[in-house]
Design a protein with these regions (language model features):
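Transmembrane beta-strand segments that form the barrel wall of outer-membrane beta-barrel proteins
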Residues: 4-10, 249-258
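Surface-exposed loop/interface segments of Gram-negative outer-membrane beta-barrel transport/assembly proteins
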Residues: 11-16, 22-111, 129-233, 260-262, ...
Length: 295
């Protein structure tokens, strides 16, 4: 099955819009004793001039709301002088017209999601299950403040590039059987979880070529790069034993190895045990208490 969604949104604020394309694919099949399920999703989004929020100087709603009731909003249209500089006296709030027509921000996002699962039904009691998943996010954000903007008098441009990737792999063996009055279920498996995030931020100040919004138009530029990587390797198992649908015993054990902890002290194990007694099985069928259990 394949679906496509096309979303277009033109904001009530001039110079603002959003477009989003979503592609979805889902397929499954059986090949003998093997069942396969796969899904994929791709989302592409482009946004022009996201609104500022909170107490930002560029929050248009806040700036209009805090105007005196005697202030004519028509006066705001005179937002620049003859030299195209900021024409305002308030250093704490940006004229909405200036923010709309002189400042800008743009973003693009590409997101990929993949999920796959295969189940091998070896026999009626035993099966193997493998699962893979991945999520890749690529986000680019450009924020521009024209020269003479309050707080950015020399001009400002920042380009941020985010590359976030996550992978998950799991393999499970599942067994269930019944012997007389006993029910038995067991699970044994392992998992690998990986994160790889990279961020690059380029900041430019002191704009010299006002007509060209680009890094080359600025005198000063700086580069900041950050990365975050993590991997967790896990093994785990669970056992459940039941007797006559009356008594149940459960035990689990899991061990994780984290790449972010010191070598030699990066493994942690946590077991669990529980038991339950379904006393309602000893009672005659009653509408008053159809099911009761101590755990």
């Amino acid at each position: 099955r394949f679906t496509y969604t096309d979303m277009r949104n033109k904001d009530i604020v001039p110079q603002s819009n959003m477009s989003r394309d979503i592609f979805n694919l889902r397929t499954n099949t059986s090949l003998g004793k093997v069942d396969v399920d796969f899904s994929a999703n791709y989302t592409r989004e482009a946004v022009k001039n996201r609104p500022a929020l909170g107490d930002s100087k560029s929050n248009i709603g806040k700036n209009l709301m805090t105007l005196a009731t005697t202030y004519d909003q028509e006066w705001l249209k005179n937002y620049q002088d003859e030299n195209s500089n900021w024409n305002g006296m308030d250093p704490y709030n940006v004229n909405p017209y200036w923010d709309v027509y002189k400042n800008s921000n743009n973003s693009k996002k590409d997101q990929f999601r993949f999920n796959g699962k295969a189940i091998w039904n070896i026999n009626k009691h035993l099966k193997l299950q493998g699962t893979i998943g991945a999520e890749l996010n690529y986000f680019i954000f450009e924020d521009f403040k024209a020269p003479t903007t309050p707080g950015y008098e020399a001009g400002y441009l920042q380009n941020s590039n985010f590359r976030n990737r996550m992978y998950n792999f799991e393999l499970l063996a599942l067994y269930n059987n019944t012997w007389g009055d006993f029910d038995f279920n067991a699970t044994l498996g392992g998992n690998v979880y990986k994160i790889n995030n990279q961020t690059t931020v380029t900041t430019a100040q002191d704009m010299q070529i006002r007509d060209v919004v680009a890094l080359m138009s600025f005198n000063e530029t700086s580069l900041e790069q950050n990365s975050y990587r993590k991997q967790i390797n896990s093994v785990y198992g669970a056992v459940n034993v039941g007797w006559k649908h009356l008594v149940y015993l459960d035990a689990t054990l899991r061990g994780d190895q984290s790449s972010t902890l010191p070598i030699g002290n990066n493994v942690y194990v946590y077991p669990s045990f529980s038991g339950s007694f379904v006393f309602s099985e000893l009672l005659k069928q009653s509408d008053l208490m159809p099911y009761g259990k101590f755990r």
